[in-house]
Amino acid sequence: MTPTEIGALLRKLPQVDRLMQSTALTGLVETHSRSLVLTECRALLDSIRARALAGDVSGEDLEEDSIIQRLSERLDQRQMPYHRRVINATGIVLHTGLGRAPLADEVADALVEQLRHPVRVEIDLETGLRGSRDEGCAQLLRELTGAEDATIVNNNAGATLLLLSALAENREVLVSHGELVEIGGSFRIPDIMEQGGARLKAVGTTNRTRANDYAEACSEDSAMILKVHTSNYRVVGFTEETSISELCEVGKTQSVPVVHDMGSGCMVDLAQRGLRGESWVRDSLESGCDLVCFSGDKLLGGPQAGIIAGSAELVQKCRKHPLYRAMRPGRMTYIALGQTLRVYLKGEE
């Protein structure tokens, strides 16, 4: 297309003012507001102008009716909620990009009902004094998992960062070479340790790490032994992995707390449903783990949250750390998580 032809096309392009005065836009202005229609109109005309300069438009593209039709489509698309219902046809049951686990009906109903009114979050209803926003969910988690105490933050990455910052700042954390994981969004265990002020001390090898490797690596500077669930890969073949019970025995002998980053947070025996390799939260605690942390919106089936459970002393240290306030969730998370945990207590599927 020659410059002369391009110039002829550009002269056919209607001006913004002319389009905005068109009676065809009256309904769009009433539906979407004049400012939004004006913004989208300018953006659309700029797009058409750029295509014309590239020789990629026809005369029909420049007709006023065609432009108004496309403007209407742009406005409808703009007004559609970004977060909206979709069909998960990916083959990934708990898809991060699709909201992970759907909430149970009674959980969703509880959210709708309670969010219409003031909700108790952290006030003692008997004394009127400020209480603990954790207490409702913490009590349910104590009953479900056998933990001495529990606290809730915004997600499991936050839980990991908080416990490292609160319990291991400027000290060593022992992790198997085979568990230095990277999950979505380039979240890497070594990076989160550095951010939390802890010093990584990798033990064993990628494919074989024994209890003795941890025992020999322990020192007076060891703040914790961290067991990380490798949820998105498996090391197979010539391998050896230290069990939770063996690891807890090492921790007990060396007087070093053992923390299990469980990732998904399984509350029931999923092996009966065909999903193997997921540790139970209660089993890890009963095996001797001082703390566990896991997600609320994966296998647990609740809202996005990070749960830290176990030793009351260590949980309290996490609560007292300055990062805790920055990571604590709001009422929607507590309502949804609490109702989800009640479903488990009632033994429902």
Region roles according to the model:
Residues 13-14, 32, 87-91, 300-303:
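Short Gly/Ser/Thr- and Asp/Glu-enriched loop/turn motifs at secondary-structure junctions
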Residues 1-76:
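Long amphipathic alpha-helical segments
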Residues 348-349:
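Helix-rich C-terminal "cap"/substrate-channel and partner-interaction subdomain
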Residues 128-344:
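Conserved PLP-enzyme active-site core in the AAT-like
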Residues 46, 89-90, 100-126:
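Glycine-rich phosphate-binding segment of PLP-dependent enzymes
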